[in-house]
């Protein structure tokens, strides 16, 4: 079957003219040739490493640039988007006028016109009924490689029928000189137009802007159809039982969802519709800082030919120093999901989730290692999206720093957070799913809860043992905590027992409870949010 390809006339419809050549859906072998051409300069050039993977640099942008994110405010988005300039909550959805959008689009199309372009057609979403058909247009070979890794790769038959319903034009080489007069944050921009169904990128080379841009769009489109859109990992057991894991960076989401007894559905972005849980992506985007074969063998072995390393330090002999964070701590690798052996095949989807796990790394030492949540507590803790880090100082004094990120992914939410919470709980109630809050952080001993105990807790959740356990109610937070679980040290289940002086727990718990309440205040501007206050801690 012949693949349809794309004509210069189609690109002209987007405003891109006089293209010298279109490289359509290039193979991995062709991309390898293209990104290692000796004539390439600067951030376009890829370096072959001894792993077989290509390494690239993304310049000053080694992460997303949330302050440069904009959405066109028009008739479609006016009353639906969670705007940065409305309500109590702070977010990155800054409004953009149609006039400035047209100016930015002109900059990007001018940058791409007259060039040799890579066009990659992909799917975002493993479920054919709700997926986005996304067309990426770029002049940089490795950016085409990145989206081929990260999104779902259509078959030749699917490409023959491909009709894009979202266009991403990456003009990383262009910037906006008029940003000051236009009242924008900087010369760089990541802008979205939901009426035109288009994303524009200018000034930043970071690959993750394309990945997370489409996640933000799925986060807009799906919940409005009653489909949950989630920043989580997901896996499935031998009996078809599905678990989803929410958690911010450093809480153990990737580690705990990688389980030899269960198959991985995906590691980062999922939807939940009438058929079940499905991955948005066709690849993984893993952190590589301090990566070792012993600690994370799956990721380590996935770094081979066709993988793409970002911002790692490559030595003169082509070896990668994963311990060197001199460019950024956010070193990454993207690879197609089939580089991991233990995955759901051929399509990254499964049935309905019965276990929903919220991971938190509580550095305050207050929360229990595990608790069962009621429906209202599920919404409350989902909206809170709490974790905390220990910030060290010279004298070894460690003050915990709390982080609250709505729905465990505030940066990517396009609608008000309560809409995601409502859709998630509806999906859970329809199938009788249960949520659990799992603390992978610290307790009164000053030590982190052991990975052995945490894995035993996850096992008890997945095999149902936790639902048979007797529970007690932890005061202030009103959480149902099991009194004993197989394979878990019984001395840690009640966090108060880990303190030599229980009054210390009380003091810390009251402090943390106040922080929860202060954070949650921003949701009380909607009736749905105000109704959940009683599910939070009592001060």
From Swiss-Prot:
<dbReference type="Pfam" id="PF01293">
    <property type="entry name" value="PEPCK_ATP"/>
</dbReference>
<comment type="similarity">
    <text>Belongs to the phosphoenolpyruvate carboxykinase (ATP) family.</text>
</comment>
<dbReference type="GO" id="GO:0005524">
    <property type="term" value="F:ATP binding"/>
</dbReference>
<feature type="binding site">
    <location>
        <position position="231"/>
    </location>
    <ligand>
        <name>Mn(2+)</name>
    </ligand>
</feature>
<dbReference type="GO" id="GO:0006094">
    <property type="term" value="P:gluconeogenesis"/>
</dbReference>
<dbReference type="GO" id="GO:0046872">
    <property type="term" value="F:metal ion binding"/>
</dbReference>
<feature type="binding site">
    <location>
        <position position="212"/>
    </location>
    <ligand>
        <name>substrate</name>
    </ligand>
</feature>
<dbReference type="GO" id="GO:0004612">
    <property type="term" value="F:phosphoenolpyruvate carboxykinase (ATP) activity"/>
</dbReference>
<keyword id="KW-0456">Lyase</keyword>
<dbReference type="GO" id="GO:0005829">
    <property type="term" value="C:cytosol"/>
</dbReference>
<comment type="function">
    <text>Involved in the gluconeogenesis. Catalyzes the conversion of oxaloacetate (OAA) to phosphoenolpyruvate (PEP) through direct phosphoryl transfer between the nucleoside triphosphate and OAA.</text>
</comment>
<feature type="binding site">
    <location>
        <position position="64"/>
    </location>
    <ligand>
        <name>substrate</name>
    </ligand>
</feature>
<keyword id="KW-0547">Nucleotide-binding</keyword>
<keyword id="KW-0067">ATP-binding</keyword>
<keyword id="KW-0963">Cytoplasm</keyword>
<keyword id="KW-0210">Decarboxylase</keyword>
<comment type="subunit">
    <text>Monomer.</text>
</comment>
<keyword id="KW-0464">Manganese</keyword>
<feature type="binding site">
    <location>
        <position position="454"/>
    </location>
    <ligand>
        <name>ATP</name>
    </ligand>
</feature>
<feature type="binding site">
    <location>
        <begin position="247"/>
        <end position="255"/>
    </location>
    <ligand>
        <name>ATP</name>
    </ligand>
</feature>
<comment type="pathway">
    <text>Carbohydrate biosynthesis; gluconeogenesis.</text>
</comment>
<dbReference type="InterPro" id="IPR015994">
    <property type="entry name" value="PEPCK_ATP_CS"/>
</dbReference>
<keyword id="KW-0312">Gluconeogenesis</keyword>
<feature type="binding site">
    <location>
        <position position="296"/>
    </location>
    <ligand>
        <name>ATP</name>
    </ligand>
</feature>
<dbReference type="InterPro" id="IPR008210">
    <property type="entry name" value="PEP_carboxykinase_N"/>
</dbReference>
<feature type="binding site">
    <location>
        <begin position="448"/>
        <end position="449"/>
    </location>
    <ligand>
        <name>ATP</name>
    </ligand>
</feature>
<protein>
    <recommendedName>
        <fullName>Phosphoenolpyruvate carboxykinase (ATP)</fullName>
        <ecNumber>4.1.1.49</ecNumber>
    </recommendedName>
</protein>
<keyword id="KW-0479">Metal-binding</keyword>
<feature type="binding site">
    <location>
        <position position="268"/>
    </location>
    <ligand>
        <name>Mn(2+)</name>
    </ligand>
</feature>
<feature type="binding site">
    <location>
        <position position="206"/>
    </location>
    <ligand>
        <name>substrate</name>
    </ligand>
</feature>
<feature type="binding site">
    <location>
        <position position="332"/>
    </location>
    <ligand>
        <name>substrate</name>
    </ligand>
</feature>
<feature type="binding site">
    <location>
        <position position="332"/>
    </location>
    <ligand>
        <name>ATP</name>
    </ligand>
</feature>
<dbReference type="InterPro" id="IPR001272">
    <property type="entry name" value="PEP_carboxykinase_ATP"/>
</dbReference>
<feature type="binding site">
    <location>
        <position position="231"/>
    </location>
    <ligand>
        <name>ATP</name>
    </ligand>
</feature>
<dbReference type="InterPro" id="IPR013035">
    <property type="entry name" value="PEP_carboxykinase_C"/>
</dbReference>
<feature type="binding site">
    <location>
        <position position="212"/>
    </location>
    <ligand>
        <name>ATP</name>
    </ligand>
</feature>
<feature type="binding site">
    <location>
        <position position="212"/>
    </location>
    <ligand>
        <name>Mn(2+)</name>
    </ligand>
</feature>
């Amino acid at each position: 079957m012949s693949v349809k390809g794309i004509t210069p006339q189609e690109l002209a419809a987007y405003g891109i003219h006089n293209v010298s050549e279109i490289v359509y859906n290039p193979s991995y072998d062709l991309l390898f040739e293209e990104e290692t051409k000796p004539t390439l300069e600067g951030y376009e050039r890829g370096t072959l490493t001894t792993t077989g993977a290509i390494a690239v640099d993304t310049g000053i942008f080694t992460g997303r640039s949330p302050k440069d994110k904009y959405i066109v405010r028009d008739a479609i988005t006016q009353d639906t988007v969670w705007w940065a300039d409305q309500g109590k909550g702070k977010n990155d959805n800054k409004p953009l006028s149609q006039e400035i959008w047209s100016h930015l689009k002109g900059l990007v199309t001018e940058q791409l016109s007259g060039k040799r372009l890579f066009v990659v057609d992909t799917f975002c979403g493993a479920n054919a009924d709700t997926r986005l058909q996304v067309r990426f247009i770029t002049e940089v070979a490795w950016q085409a490689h990145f989206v081929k890794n990260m999104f779902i790769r259509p078959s030749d038959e699917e490409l023959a029928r491909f009709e894009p319903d979202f266009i991403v034009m990456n003009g990383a080489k262009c910037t906006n000189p008029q940003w000051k007069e236009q009242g924008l944050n900087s010369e760089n921009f990541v802008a979205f137009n939901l009426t035109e169904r288009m994303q524009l990128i200018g000034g930043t080379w970071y690959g993750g802007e394309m990945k997370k841009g489409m996640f933000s769009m799925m986060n807009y489109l799906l919940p409005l159809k009653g489909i949950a859109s989630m920043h989580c990992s997901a896996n499935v057991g031998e009996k078809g039982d599905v678990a989803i894991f929410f958690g911010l960076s450093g809480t153990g989401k990737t580690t705990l969802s990688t389980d030899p007894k269960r198959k991985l559905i995906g590691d980062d972005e999922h939807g939940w519709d009438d058929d079940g849980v499905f991955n948005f992506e066709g690849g993984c985007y893993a952190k590589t800082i301090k990566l070792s074969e012993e600690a994370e063998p799956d990721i380590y072995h996935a770094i081979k030919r066709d993988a793409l390393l970002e911002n790692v330090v490559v030595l003169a002999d082509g070896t990668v120093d994963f311990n060197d964070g001199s460019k950024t701590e956010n070193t990454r690798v993207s690879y197609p999901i089939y580089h991991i052996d233990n995955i759901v095949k051929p399509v990254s989807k499964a049935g309905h989730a019965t276990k929903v796990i919220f991971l938190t790394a509580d550095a305050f030492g207050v929360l229990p290692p595990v608790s069962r949540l009621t429906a209202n507590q599920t919404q409350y803790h989902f909206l809170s999206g709490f974790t905390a880090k220990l910030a060290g100082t010279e004298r070894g004094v460690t003050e915990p720093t709390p982080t609250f990120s709505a729905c465990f992914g505030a940066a990517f939410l396009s609608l008000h957070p309560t809409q995601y919470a409502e859709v998630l709980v509806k999906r859970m109630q329809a199938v009788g799913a249960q949520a659990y809050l799992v603390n992978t952080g610290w307790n009164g001993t000053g030590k982190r809860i052991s990975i052995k105990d945490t894995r035993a807790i996850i096992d008890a959740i997945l095999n149902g043992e936790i639902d048979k356990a007797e529970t007690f109610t932890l005061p202030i937070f009103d959480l149902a905590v099991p009194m004993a679980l197989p394979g878990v040290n019984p001395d840690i289940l009640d966090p108060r027992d880990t303190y030599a002086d229980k009054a210390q727990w009380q003091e810390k718990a009251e402090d943390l409870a106040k922080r929860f309440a202060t954070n949650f205040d921003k949701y009380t501007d909607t009736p749905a949010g105000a109704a959940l206050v009683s599910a939070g801690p009592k001060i």
